[in-house]
Amino acid sequence: MAKEELLEMRGKVVELLPNAMFRVELENGHEVLGHTAGKMRKNRIRVLVGDEVLCELTPYDLTKARITYRFMPGRGGPGQGPGPQ
């Protein structure tokens, strides 16, 4: 599957589940089951309940997602430069 086919959506972590899984509520109100991407695991980026995250979904299964970015309060997202100072 090519990367162009992935859907990126913003969401909020609402529940921590076993085996490094998370229940994420997307901007549109849908809830998906998410897991952290390998680079986030490798760099030990913690994801907690209430965190704003960026998820990648495949058009073939819209119930599962990969968490690729955790938004920091007061900072911009990926590719947005520094936040307010």
Swiss-Prot record:
Main localization, broad class: cytoplasm
Subunit description: Component of the 30S ribosomal translation pre-initiation complex which assembles on the 30S ribosome in the order IF-2 and IF-3, IF-1 and N-formylmethionyl-tRNA(fMet); mRNA recruitment can occur at any time during PIC assembly.
Query: According to its UniProt entry, what is the function of this protein?
Result: One of the essential components for the initiation of protein synthesis. Stabilizes the binding of IF-2 and IF-3 on the 30S subunit to which N-formylmethionyl-tRNA(fMet) subsequently binds. Helps modulate mRNA selection, yielding the 30S pre-initiation complex (PIC). Upon addition of the 50S ribosomal subunit IF-1, IF-2 and IF-3 are released leaving the mature 70S translation initiation complex.
Question: Could you read off the lineage of the organism from its UniProt record?
Answer: Bacteria, Pseudomonadati, Pseudomonadota, Alphaproteobacteria, Sphingomonadales
Q: Is Magnesium given among the entry's keywords?
A: no
Q: Where does the protein end up?
A: Cytoplasm
Give each disulfide bond as a residue pair: none
Q: Which sequence ranges are marked TM in the entry?
A: none
Give the species: Erythrobacter litoralis (strain HTCC2594)
Domain S1-like stretches? 1-72
How is this protein named in the record?
Answer: Translation initiation factor IF-1
UniProt KW DNA-binding keyword: no
